[in-house]
Structure formats: C-alpha cells, structure tokens
Amino acid sequence: IMRRGLYKNKQAVMEGSEAIKVDGTIYTGQLGNDYYTFDVVDESGKINLNALTDGSGVIINNLLVNLGVKKEDADTIVDSILDWKDADEFHRLHGAESDYYMSLPNPYKSKNARLDAVEELLMVKGITPEILYGSNEKAGLFDLLTVYARTGGINVNAAPKEVLAALPGMTPELANKVSSLRESAEMKTLEDLGSIVGMSLPLMSPYVGVSESNTYTIKATGYKKNEKQGFTIMATVVIESNSKYRCVYYKSPAGARQRQE
C-alpha cells in the first residue's frame, strides 16, 4: 500500500520500503523462490482525454503521427474523440457521432459524456487495438493517456518523452533534453522549462504545468520459479492522505509481462 506520495525528484514512498521513482522504472524483488516486479507511474504526466479540447487536440494528433499513424487517420481519431465526449450530436469535420456508430454491424450510440477508462477508446472511430495497445513493432497510446481529472495541464516533470515530443514547439532533441535535465532537478515553474526550450515555451505553455500529483498507476507482476511469463495486475489509486487512498481503476490480469533476466 502506498503510504504517502512525494513528488520531489519524481519519487513516492511505499510502506516498508525506500523511496522509489514514479516514472515507470521497474523494480524487482524475491519471495522465496518466486519473483515479482512492479512500477509506479504518475498520471499527471499523461494526456488527459477528459480535458481534451479542439485546441489541445493537436497534442494527440502529434502523438499519433509520431507513433506512425497517418495524418488523415490522426485527424479522424482526434475529432472522433472530441465528438465522443461532447454533449451534442454535431460531428466535427473528420469526426463521428451516433449516426456513424448506429450504422455499424453492432450498432451503439455516441457516449456524449466523459470517458470512464482509456479502453473506451476502442469504441471511437479510427481507434484499433494496435493503435491503442501497440504491437511488437510499434508503441501504443495506452500508457500515454489518462481519464483522471486534474488542473494545471500536462506535468512536464512526469511526462514520458513521447508526450513531451508531442507538445507544440517541442522537438525530439528538446524532449530528450527536458527528460535528461529533470532527473537531477525538477522544474518548479514554467520559467524553468523555458530555460530549456527557449522561444518554444509560448507554443507549449497553454498545455503544460508543473503541479504535483496525487494519482498513480501501479503495475505489478508475479512469477513462479524459473518461469518468464508472469501474472500482472494494474491499479490506479488516488492518494488522499498519508494513510488513505482510493482505487479508481483495477484490472486483473493486465496483460503479459515477461521477466527480464
């Protein structure tokens, strides 16, 4: 159980354990002859689907293109996500509403409300399992998106490099530089980010922040002796105090993860 969340230096404290990083670093341990791995990820560094607007949609569009999706398909996906969660039945230029979904072999209506889980994207026009979860050749969207509300934009102290690289004005070189420098010193203000990205800051500043997080996703995998294929569970928890937390998402099994030798 997480005892308390510490954002400084991207760390959290687990009960009975030392401080750990909350950037997806994989930790290992042993129970008798069996093994386990776990990692903790700060949700504030992901792109919040429920906070997506016509303006910030450019970030997911850039992310999709960077992941190998064709630009026209990315346009369809972004507009369709916005249509899926807005309250009306008017579709955007490349989007879809209930008239499209009701024409499918297994018809359903557009939700026209906030998303409850990232997996819900599989119901949105243009999204395929490969785009969402990735493949052996390509990364997917799943680990880069969230549905949990917060303020302050994408937290640049916690954002994966793929998310950083999708920000307007950000280049792969700048994303690598931000990712490297924040390991030694977290950014406390957007001016700190500006000292790294320079004149690109005004382009990305409407979409980012440095606010602390209280929501984390924990993925843990257990392995029997000499077996490489483990059993994985995943949970997203909101830390409400030093002794209280609330689970907002749980999945078991949560996909296969092979033990690294």
Residue spans for each PLM region:
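Compositionally biased linear targeting/interaction segments
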Residues: 1-261
